[in-house]
C-alpha cells in the first residue's frame, strides 16, 4: 500500500488487505496456506502473522540464512541461539517457512537489530574476499550499506582453499540445522545439487544474482550426480539421506516442541519432542576443532552415524551433527 508522506512499508492498510484476502480464502478455499515473503528486519517480518488467525499462516524465516552463515563463519553459535530462543508463534495455526538459500541473494536487512553493524560489515568483507558479490543501497547521507550477498550457499560457507570433504561437511551441517528448526524446511534446487558460484552466468547476464541461478542440461547434471567422485554426488546423497531421516521421525513435525541452547560457544543443542513424550536431541559442532561435551542423561542412538551413545561424554568431530534418539 502506497501513501504519500510515508515510507509505504508495513502500513496498516497493507495488513488490512492481507486480512481481507485471508477471510476470502478461508471461505472459498479452506485449507489453503498463505505465506508471506517479506525480506525485512525480523520484528517487521513476524508482524505478518497478524493475530495468529487473520493474516499469513507461514512467514519466510529470513533471519535464518545469514545467522547460520554467521555461526559457521565465526565458529560461534551464540548469536544464532540467542535469536532462536526468542522465537514464538502467535497461534498453533501458524509456523515458520525455513530456508537457507533461494534464487535471490542472502539478505542482510534481517540481521539488523540482531547483530551489531560492525559484525555485519565484517561478514560481508570476509565473503567478498572469498569471491561473493554484494548488492549495496545508497543512503541519504551519501554512504552505502550492503543489503544482499550474492553467492551460492556452498561457497558462502567455505573458503577457496577448502577441500571438497570440508565443503560438504560444512554444507550438511548448515542444512541439518535447517532441518532441525521448528517449521517447514525448504531447500533450494542449487543447494541440493551442490552448485558453486556461476561467474560465467553473472558475466553473461549482467547481474549479481545470476551467480546462484545456473541452468543445467539434464544429462550433464545426471552424470555428475551419479559420479561418486564429485562434490555434487556427496552433497545430493547425504542431504537426501538427512531429509529421509527427518521424514521418518515425528519429533520434527512443525507443531512439536522446540528448545535450543548452547553447550559451548561452538556447539548448539536443539531438542524436539512430541506429545507422546518422545525426544530427539540434535548436537551441532560449527567449529573446525574436535569438541568433547559432557551431557548427563543423554542416551540413545545417533540416527546419522548409527552409533549408540552410552556415556555422558560425547565427542563431536569438526562440523559434525548428531541426531540422538
Where does each model-flagged region fall?
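Active-site and adjacent substrate-binding regions of carbohydrate-active enzymes
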Residues: 1-299, 305-325
Amino acid at each position: 500500500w502506497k501513501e504519500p508522506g510515508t515510507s509505504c512499508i508495513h502500513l496498516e492498510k497493507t495488513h488490512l488487505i492481507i486480512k481481507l484476502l485471508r477471510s476470502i480464502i478461508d471461505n472459498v478455499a479452506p485449507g489453503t496456506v498463505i505465506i508471506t515473503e517479506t525480506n525485512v528486519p525480523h520484528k517487521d517480518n513476524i508482524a505478518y502473522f497478524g493475530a495468529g488467525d487473520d493474516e499469513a499462516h507461514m512467514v519466510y524465516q529470513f533471519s535464518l540464512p545469514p545467522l547460520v552463515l554467521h555461526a559457521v563463519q565465526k565458529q560461534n553459535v551464540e548469536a544464532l541461539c540467542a535469536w532462536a530462543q526468542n522465537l514464538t508463534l502467535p497461534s498453533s495455526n501458524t509456523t515458520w517457512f525455513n530456508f537457507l538459500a533461494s534464487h535471490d541473494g542472502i539478505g542482510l536487512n534481517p540481521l539488523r537489530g540482531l547483530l551489531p553493524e560492525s559484525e555485519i560489515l565484517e561478514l560481508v568483507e570476509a565473503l567478498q574476499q572469498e569471491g561473493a558479490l554484494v548488492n549495496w543501497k545508497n543512503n541519504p547521507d551519501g554512504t552505502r550499506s550492503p543489503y544482499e550477498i550474492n553467492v551460492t550457499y556452498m561457497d558462502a560457507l567455505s573458503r577457496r582453499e577448502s577441500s571438497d570433504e570440508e565443503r560438504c561437511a560444512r554444507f550438511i551441517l548448515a542444512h541439518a540445522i535447517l532441518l532441525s528448526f521448528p517449521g517447514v524446511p525448504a531447500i533450494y534446487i542449487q543447494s541440493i545439487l551442490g552448485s558453486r558460484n556461476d561467474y560465467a552466468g553473472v558475466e553473461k547476464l549482467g547481474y549479481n544474482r545470476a551467480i546462484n541461478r545456473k541452468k543445467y542440461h539434464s544429462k550433464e547434471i545426471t552424470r555428475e550426480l551419479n559420479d561418486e567422485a564429485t562434490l555434487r554426488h556427496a552433497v545430493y546423497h547425504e542431504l537426501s539421506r538427512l531429509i529421509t531421516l527427518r521424514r521418518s521421525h515425528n519429533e520434527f513435525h512443525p507443531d512439536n516442541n522446540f528448545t535450543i541452547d548452547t553447550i559451548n560457544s561452538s556447539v548448539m543443542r536443539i531438542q524436539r519432542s512430541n506429545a507422546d513424550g518422545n525426544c530427539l536431541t540434535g548436537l551441532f559442532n560449527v567449529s573446525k576443532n574436535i569438541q568433547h561435551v559432557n551431557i548427563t542423561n543423554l542416551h540413545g542412538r545417533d540416527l546419522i552415524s548409527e552409533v549408540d551413545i552410552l556415556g555422558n561424554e560425547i565427542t563431536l568431530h569438526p562440523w559434525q551433527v548428531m541426531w540422538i534418539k
